[in-house]
């Protein structure tokens, strides 16, 4: 499956991230059953990563690049685009499909 992007609320439909730009995001990460495992919103601190530098899972790289600034979306990410057979011990089980509620706040 890879990553499926479902728009929750639209962005500007003009400003899309490019490689080597820093994406400033808010997110909530959940397992497929809805169990939350992480949230930048809970910390009230946006998360930043540079696109194309493999700082995040493949599902984020391929999902966020499809978003425009201001857009909020649901990313459903298959295990092979997330943490695969290993998972993330104590947080994400092996072979887990992940669901993220993400918002692209701005680009730097």
UniProtKB/Swiss-Prot annotation:
A GO term, aspect molecular function: peptidyl-prolyl cis-trans isomerase activity
Keyword field contains Cell membrane: no
Listed name of the protein: Peptidyl-prolyl cis-trans isomerase FKBP1C
Leading EC class: isomerase
Sequence similarity: Belongs to the FKBP-type PPIase family. FKBP1 subfamily.
Protein EC: 5.2.1.8
GO annotation terms (biological process): negative regulation of activin receptor signaling pathway; negative regulation of transforming growth factor beta receptor signaling pathway
Primary gene name: FKBP1C
SUPFAM superfamilies reported in the protein's UniProt record: FKBP-like
PROSITE patterns listed in its UniProt record: FKBP_PPIASE (PS50059)
Gene Ontology annotations for the cellular component aspect, listed alphabetically: cytoplasm; sarcoplasmic reticulum membrane
The organism's taxonomic lineage, starting at the top: Eukaryota, Metazoa, Chordata, Craniata, Vertebrata
Catalytic activity: [protein]-peptidylproline (omega=180) = [protein]-peptidylproline (omega=0)
Domain PPIase FKBP-type: 20-108
Keywords annotated in UniProt: Isomerase, Rotamase
One Pfam assignment: FKBP_C
């Amino acid at each position: 499956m890879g990553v499926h992007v479902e728009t929750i609320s639209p962005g500007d439909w003009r400003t899309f991230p490019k490689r080597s730009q820093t994406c400033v995001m808010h997110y909530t990460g959940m397992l497929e059953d809805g169990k939350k495992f992480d949230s930048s919103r809970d910390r009230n601190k946006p998360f930043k990563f540079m696109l194309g530098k493999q700082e995040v899972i493949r599902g984020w790289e391929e999902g966020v690049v499809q978003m425009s600034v201001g857009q909020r979306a649901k990313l459903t990410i298959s295990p092979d685009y997330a943490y695969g057979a290993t998972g993330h011990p104590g947080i994400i089980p092996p072979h887990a499909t992940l669901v993220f509620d993400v918002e692209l706040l701005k680009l730097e």
